[in-house]
């Protein structure tokens, strides 16, 4: 004989380290769940990146140049130096309704034509199939107010003809290139680039709504501080449309800037056009008065001194008129307390003082000379004013015609070649990380809130006897997996583990249980053993059937009664039929003495559950069941009764009154200590003592760091 013993001693570490190790081990055990969930997230991300609508980006560059100083105020000095452009204000102008509204009107953006596709995946599928360029160009679409809530659908018949219908009953047929008018609806389709049968939804948006959409998709930033260069970026689904939209925005911004710059000249020209006739009229009146006075006084000539005074007064009036123009310009930029404005006012005051002195000299002249000086001054001053206005008019006309504004489009809009979003690599990576995190958190939370029994010591520390610890059979697990893949229920086996692989560690543990039962049942009132469970699907029937098999191998007659009349499957496990089973016996349709069915294992008989009755618990409370147990106890060395889980139904509490020994099966890492204690409490309330617990399906866990260690034993015959 060859004996192999393996001991895996758990390290003795601090509590914090044990907790970390347990968490890591829990994740390692559930690695396939983690991998599976992460793979699902990654797959969803891949599908999303394939079917999500790509968003493109177009950009343009504009420069805001510094305004040149006005010719009328350049000579004021350094106080009138040029200012850097106010970029923040210009950014707001670009995003204003004035600029964007004109773009909406120019490009007919308030009319949207969208192809009808399958929800979510349709547009992406069309792109994959190369059909994303199917479009219908609509330039005019109006409908009466009562139809504003209706949805209009355009159906393509061919590359020239189409039909237009609405969910309100409207229907019409039209041709591309011709205006369709019917019942107040006006539609102009310029071109059709789509397959026959394609459907499009035609929508009319409000101008304000489209402006808001443009503002959401438009980004304007300044390149550098006070650099006067603005970067415009626009995002959207259509590569060509976003380029056209951004070009239109830049062009409209430039045009409004030019209009704003030339508006002042236009207003000044209009004012001069109104003032020139009046000034000319006053000049004519002054000339007529002077000529009449000269004729009346026989052409009076002025002495040299009077002429000098007259020339000085005319010159001062000309300077005062020039200052009036300058003051009009400066007042737009500065207040009267500004040094430049104060300089102008001081110069005006000096001229006024000089003019007052000259007026005093004129007053000292003879009356005839005073009058001729006054009339001559009025004529010459009027002529200078008139000529100044004519010169100003010509300047303004030149200014208006040559205005270029402060905005220059440096780079026209161009759509970038790549896709702005979705960023496929980043999305897939993010989905993998998210799936990994969520799966790990889920595994840890499940482990935290569902702490199954992880060692026999947990039960023993609470005063619960553990009669056997049965390891998980890899041989049985492999056979169950094959059966599952083939679509057969896991419990439908043709061979017990005790027969198919009698040297399995699980069977050795059941043999150890057989030895323990031999001594445990010595003081029992009868030879009837009830096997119950804490909850469903814990391997109770597996333990019960294999225990009966190994006991029968000791030359003892064993009867297994399947008392789970709801879901019992022992007859399938042992390869027998379900005819004339327990339910038929209890309702009097079967004979107790002939109910036992032999199995393929010698001295091992079975009473199957029979047909599923409507009242299993009531049948177990009948006298007929007591008679069956008494008969079986007398005719067999051991009677094993397989009952349903105590936490699920009350059948085990009923059967327990007729047995001498009760054992309860709990599954390792599945059932909790609370469930075991609750089950024992149920039996205690019904006066049924439970001898102990069988811990089933023990496996080596990565998270099970225990100070008692983990042992594996193999004890096989030497090969001959």
Swiss-Prot record:
Q: What does the UniProt record note about how this protein's activity is regulated?
A: Dephosphorylated and activated by wzb.
Q: How is it modified after translation?
A: Autophosphorylated. Seems to be phosphorylated through a cooperative two-step mechanism. First, Tyr-569 is phosphorylated in an intramolecular reaction that generates a significant increase of protein kinase activity. Then Tyr-708, Tyr-710, Tyr-711, Tyr-713 and Tyr-715 are phosphorylated in an intermolecular Tyr-569-dependent reaction.
The UniProt GO MF terms for this protein read: ATP binding; protein tyrosine kinase activity
Keyword field: ATP-binding, Cell inner membrane, Cell membrane, Exopolysaccharide synthesis, Kinase, Membrane, Nucleotide-binding, Phosphoprotein, Transferase, Transmembrane, Transmembrane helix, Tyrosine-protein kinase
Tell me what topology the record assigns in the membrane: Multi-pass membrane protein
The record ties this protein, via InterPro entries, to:
AAA_dom, Bact_polysacc_biosynth/exp, GNVR, LPS_length_determ_N_term, P-loop_NTPase, Wzc-like_C
SUPFAM superfamilies assigned: P-loop containing nucleoside triphosphate hydrolases
- EC number from the UniProt entry: 2.7.10.-
| Annotated GO CC locations | plasma membrane
Question: Which parts of the sequence lie on the Cytoplasmic side of the lipid bilayer?
Answer: 1-31, 446-720
UniProt keyword Ribosomal protein present: no
**Pathway(s) of this molecule:** Glycan metabolism; exopolysaccharide biosynthesis
> Which compartment or compartments is the protein found in?
Cell inner membrane
Q: Name one GO biological process term.
A: polysaccharide biosynthetic process
**Modified sites of kind Phosphotyrosine:** 569, 708, 710-711, 713, 715
Periplasmic membrane side: 53-424
**UniProt catalytic activity:** L-tyrosyl-[protein] + ATP = O-phospho-L-tyrosyl-[protein] + ADP + H(+)
Q: Which family does it belong to?
A: Belongs to the etk/wzc family.
Entry function: Required for the extracellular polysaccharide colanic acid synthesis. The autophosphorylated form is inactive. Probably involved in the export of colanic acid from the cell to medium. Phosphorylates udg.
Q: PANTHER family of this UniProt entry?
A: TYROSINE-PROTEIN KINASE, TYROSINE-PROTEIN KINASE ETK-RELATED
Q: Give the protein name, as stated in the record.
A: Tyrosine-protein kinase wzc
Q: Which organism is it from?
A: Escherichia coli O157:H7
């Amino acid at each position: 004989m060859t004996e192999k013993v393996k001991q895996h001693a758990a390290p003795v570490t601090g509590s914090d380290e044990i907790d970390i190790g347990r968490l890591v081990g829990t994740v390692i055990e559930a690695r396939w769940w983690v991998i599976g969930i992460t793979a699902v997230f990654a797959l969803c991300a891949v599908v999303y990146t394939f079917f999500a609508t790509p968003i493109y980006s177009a950009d343009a560059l504009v420069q805001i140049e510094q305004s040149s100083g006005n010719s009328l105020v350049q000579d004021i000095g350094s106080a009138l130096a040029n200012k850097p452009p106010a970029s923040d204000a210009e950014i707001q102008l670009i995003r204003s309704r004035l600029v964007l509204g004109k773009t909406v009107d120019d490009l007919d953006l308030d009319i949207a034509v969208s192809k009808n596709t399958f929800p979510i995946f349709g547009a992406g599928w069309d792109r994959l199939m190369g059909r994303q360029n199917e479009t219908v160009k609509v330039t005019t679409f109006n409908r009466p107010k009562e139809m504003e809530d209706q949805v209009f659908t355009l159906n393509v018949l061919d590359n020239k003809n189409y039909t237009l219908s609405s969910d309100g009953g409207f229907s019409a047929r039209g041709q591309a290139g011709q205006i369709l008018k019917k019942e107040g609806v006006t539609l102009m389709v310029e071109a059709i680039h789509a397959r026959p049968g394609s459907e499009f939804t035609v929508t009319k948006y409000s101008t304000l709504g489209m402006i808001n959409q443009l503002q959401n998709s438009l980004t304007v930033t300044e390149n550098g501080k006070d650099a006067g260069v603005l970067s415009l970026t626009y995002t959207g689904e259509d590569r060509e449309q976003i380029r056209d939209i951004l070009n239109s925005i830049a062009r409209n911004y430039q045009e409004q800037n030019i209009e704003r710059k030339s508006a002042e000249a236009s207003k000044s020209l209009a004012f001069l056009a109104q003032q020139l006739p009046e000034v000319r009229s006053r000049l004519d009146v002054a000339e007529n008065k002077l000529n009449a006075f000269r004729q009346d006084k026989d052409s009076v000539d002025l002495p040299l001194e009077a002429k000098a005074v007259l020339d000085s007064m005319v010159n001062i009036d000309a300077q005062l008129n020039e200052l009036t123009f300058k003051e009009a310009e400066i007042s737009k930029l500065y207040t009267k307390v500004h040094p430049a404005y104060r300089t102008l006012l001081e110069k005006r005051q000096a001229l006024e003082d000089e003019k007052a002195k000259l007026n005093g000299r004129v007053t000292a002249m003879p009356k005839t000379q005073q009058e001729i000086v006054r009339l001559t001054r009025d004529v010459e001053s009027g002529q200078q004013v008139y000529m100044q206005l004519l010169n100003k008019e010509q300047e303004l006309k030149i200014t208006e015609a040559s205005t270029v504004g402060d905005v220059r489009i440096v780079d026209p809009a161009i759509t970038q070649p790549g896709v702005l979003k979705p960023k496929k690599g980043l999305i897939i990576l993010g989905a993998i990380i998210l799936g990994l995190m969520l799966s790990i958190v889920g595994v840890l939370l499940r482990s935290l809130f569902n702490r199954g029994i992880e060692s026999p010591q947990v039960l023993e520390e609470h005063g619960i006897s553990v009669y056997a610890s049965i390891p998980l059979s890899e041989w049985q697990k492999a056979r169950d997996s094959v059966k599952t893949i083939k679509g057969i229920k896991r419990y439908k086996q043709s061979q017990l583990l005790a027969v198919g692989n009698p040297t399995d560690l699980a069977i050795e543990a059941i043999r150890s249980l057989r030895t323990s039962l031999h001594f445990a049942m010595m003081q029992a009132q009868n030879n009837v053993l009830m096997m119950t469970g804490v909850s469903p699907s814990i391997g109770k029937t597996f333990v019960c059937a294999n225990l009966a098999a190994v006991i029968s191998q000791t030359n003892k007659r064993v009867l297994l009664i399947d008392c789970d009349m709801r879901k019992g499957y022992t007859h399938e496990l042992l390869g027998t039929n379900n005819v004339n089973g327990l339910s038929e016996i209890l309702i009097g349709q079967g004979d107790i003495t002939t109910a036992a069915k032999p199995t393929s294992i010698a001295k091992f008989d079975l009473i199957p559950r029979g047909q599923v009755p409507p009242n299993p618990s009531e049948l177990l409370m009948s006298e007929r069941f007591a008679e069956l147990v008494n008969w079986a106890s007398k005719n067999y060395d051991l009677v094993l009764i397989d009952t349903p889980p105590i936490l699920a139904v009350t059948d085990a509490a009923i059967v327990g009154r007729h047995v001498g020994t009760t054992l309860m099966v709990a599954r390792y890492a599945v059932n909790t200590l609370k469930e075991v204690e609750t089950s024992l409490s149920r039996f205690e309330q019904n006066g049924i003592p439970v001898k102990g617990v069988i811990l089933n399906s023990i496996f080596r866990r990565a998270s099970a760091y225990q100070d008692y260690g983990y042992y594996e034993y193999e004890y096989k015959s030497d090969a001959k």
